[in-house]
Amino acid sequence: MSLAGVYTEWDPLEEIVVGTAVGSENRMVRETEDELDGLCEELRGLGVTVRRLPPQDPASPPAPPDRGADTALAYRPRDGLLTVGETVIQTPAVPGLPSLQSPACRMLLMEYFTSGSRWISAPPPVLTDVMYDPTAPAGERLRELEPVFDADTVLRIGTDLLYLVSDSGNALGARWLQAALGERYTVHPCRGPHGSPHGDFAVVPLGPGLILVNPERVDAEHIPPFLRTWKRIVCPELVDPGPPDGAVHSSGWGGSNILVVRPGLVIVDRRQADLMRVLENNGIDVLPLQLTHARALGSGFHRVTVDVRRTGTLESYRF
């Protein structure tokens, strides 16, 4: 039986991969690792199988200055791994980001493969010197020369996948993903009013017919037609805790990067009291945790994890 199987962002979580901060700046490691350990403990307490990634190989190439730490994919595995149905995809990361090529990661992918999961890897970009222009305006930094996209550019809603065309994924990446997945799925390339990454900072599907939206990055014009009938919870203004250490590598909206454990239960940064209140007022229970250095390390609870298996089957959610 395939150990991989994910069809939506909200089906009950069964197995997840959690990143590691080891290898980041020393002053951040202990606190962040303790918080990630706490996340793992809470998830295990909810009956979820938890896997941990090893630290990134220090020989990996450095990331561009505005793309985060060199250890990006060990801490943020959702940048590089995407599960759609029973297929695990290694995505063609934006040039300059390291790839998940450690022996331990390969062994994990082999375990999923030998269980019956489909494992595919997108062609890694080769035009790295000209693909990414950090001096271009936000949303125009990726050129359309070959497919590139981070995995968290994609949100799964049954037979429909939202793909944010942005500085984390170009339109060719959406075309490659559609070709790789075939006719069972429809990939919707979306452009928002805010061109910077990532898709999971803009929209959070909470359950059938219910989404959390970032008011700065999503408006009615940029939502695919099939989502316009869904109830939208507008994310309130978030508390910006700022980076206690290190440079900023994510926006002040990182607090909306929440993890859905199952319909009606989400993991939220405990510092976001207004967001928790809004969710609870809409019938969503909240498990409050914290990633103190989230902005410095460019993350949130969704981005530091990869859901590998959720209970559910492939369905259409076009109401």
From Swiss-Prot:
The keyword Transferase applies. Pathway: Antibiotic biosynthesis; streptomycin biosynthesis. InterPro entries: AmidinoTrfase. The record marks R303 as: Corresponds to active site cysteine in strB1. GO terms for biological process: streptomycin biosynthetic process. SUPFAM superfamilies: Pentein. Keywords: Antibiotic biosynthesis, Streptomycin biosynthesis, Transferase. Its EC number is 2.1.4.2. One of its GO terms (molecular function) is scyllo-inosamine-4-phosphate amidinotransferase activity. Residues 55-65 have a biased composition (Pro residues). It catalyses: 1-amino-1-deoxy-scyllo-inositol 4-phosphate + L-arginine = 1-guanidino-1-deoxy-scyllo-inositol 4-phosphate + L-ornithine. Belongs to the amidinotransferase family. It is not obvious if strB2 participates in streptomycin biosynthesis as an inosamine-phosphate amidinotransferase. The nucleophilic cysteine which is the key residue for amidine transfer is not conserved but replaced by an arginine residue. This is Putative inosamine-phosphate amidinotransferase 2. It comes from Streptomyces glaucescens.
